[in-house]
A protein has these predicted regions:
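Basic, Lys/Arg- and aromatic-enriched nucleic-acid-binding interface segment
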Residues: 143, 147-154, 158-160, 173-240, ...
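N-terminal DNA-binding module of tyrosine recombinases/phage integrases
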Residues: 20-124, 128-131, 294-309
């Protein structure tokens, strides 16, 4: 507890202990000067309140020794949302979340939270603020885009609202909010319509696969890695030869490439702990990889001293990791060349999972191969193809009507 006493000049000396880090009491102190003209009892009450605020500021990291601070500067409940986000929240999420997630959370905070609620004290934020935020996002004008008046999807609204909830959760943990009031169960969110996954059916996958025979060894290996093994884009780009065991026919996934705005491309651990995994591949796929490795050796010899050996499987002309956007561009051009409908590169991962399920692979195995944390994520691949649905309808009609 804070202690205080009155000096001869009428000011109060307030002391707070920060513990005994070296076996010796670590005390910090400050001075409270009551306003002139108030009674002794009022001055005593003011000193007591100030002592409580000072103690809270010390334990919450707001107090800076050697620097004069006003009462409102050390009041943990006087902090505005903008100040909390910029001074504290960003630092906390940078050590907890992935760089790409941090970038997204910051963009939502800067674009929406700070302009709308930045001047509100953290202690005054209520579920009504979150509800108004959700309602605004769900309205037609929330995109800040005159050319697109359509409202954000329900899933996107909830994703943005999660950032607001995250801010208040951290504020509660740090003592700036008395309680975590943004409980999701009391917020009315717009209806979320889950889009059906986009994947190639059997015939389209066969056209895709056969078309790869005409491509360069690197393009063939890159797209087959997505189609046959279901790796995420960042996992493909971050793959190294040391991760591959040709004798065992296995590949260890332990890193992912990423790129945030204004920063160079880098590597990080995969999306979740479940994403650190070993996947197995066929001899046919191994032959494709080995063919590419032979060509990569030739490229290295040709580049000479310009070659920057880092051990990446997929490289540019001087041995560096390829740009993370390149696989997406390669996939798009290849689909157009084959006359296939456009799928994002991630659609090859969906195709891989859907074909596994359709061909009898149990869902737990697919979950393990794909590195999903939750079985519900894997269950999206249980969605039948239109052709399978048509056969089911025909079979039922034949059974009843014949």
């Amino acid at each position: 507890m804070a202690s205080y006493y009155r000096r001869k000049n009428g000011a109060y000396c307030i002391r707070v202990s920060r513990g005994k880090p070296g076996g010796k009491q670590d005390l910090v102190s400050t001075t409270y000067k009551p306003p002139k003209g108030i009674s002794a009892s009022a001055a005593e009450r003011g000193a007591k309140e100030f002592a409580e605020l000072f103690e809270a500021s010390v334990h919450n990291g707001l107090f800076t020794p050697g620097r004069k601070q006003k009462v409102e500067q050390i009041n943990p409940f006087g902090l505005t949302l903008a100040d909390f986000i910029q001074k504290h929240y960003y630092k906390r999420i940078e050590v907890k979340l992935s760089p790409t997630t941090v970038q997204f959370y910051k963009s939502v905070a800067e674009q929406f939270l700070i302009p709308s609620f930045g001047r509100v004290r953290v202690c005054d934020i209520s579920s009504a603020h979150l509800q108004s935020f959700v309602d605004y996002l769900a309205s037609a004008g929330s995109r800040y885009n005159e050319e697109n008046s359509e409202p954000l999807s329900g899933a996107t609204v909830k994703r943005y609202a999660t950032v607001f909830s995250s801010v208040m959760t951290e504020a509660h943990k740090m003592g700036y909010a008395e309680k975590d009031i943004l409980h999701r169960q009391i917020i009315d969110y717009p209806r979320i319509v889950k889009p059906q996954i986009q994947a190639y059916d059997d015939d389209e996958a066969r056209i895709f696969f056969n078309g790869l025979k005409e491509e360069s060894p690197q393009i063939r290996a890159l797209l087959m890695t997505s189609l046959l093994l279901g790796l995420r884009r960042g996992e493909v780009v971050g793959l190294m030869w040391s991760d591959i065991n040709f004798k065992a026919g296995s590949m260890y996934i332990s890193r992912s490439a990423y790129k945030t705005k204004g920063q160079p491309q880098a590597l990080k651990p995969p999306k979740s702990q479940s994403s650190v995994r070993t996947v197995f591949f066929s001899e046919a796929y191994a032959e494709v990889l080995l063919a590419w490795r032979e060509e990569q050796v030739e490229q290295r010899i040709k580049a000479g001293r310009s070659w920057n050996e880092q051990g990446f499987v997929f490289t540019n002309e001087v041995g560096n990791m390829i740009n993370i956007c390149l696989p997406t561009e390669i996939c798009s051009r290849f689909e157009e060349k084959c006359g296939l409908r456009h799928l994002k590169l991630h659609g090859l991962r969906h195709t891989c999972g859907s074909l596994m399920i359709k061909n009898g692979v149990d869902i737990e195995t697919v979950k393990s191969v794909f590195g999903h944390e939750n079985i519900r994520t894997t269950q999206q691949y249980l969605t039948a193809y239109d052709s399978a649905k048509k056969r089911a309808a025909d079979a039922l009609a034949a059974c009843i009507m014949n």
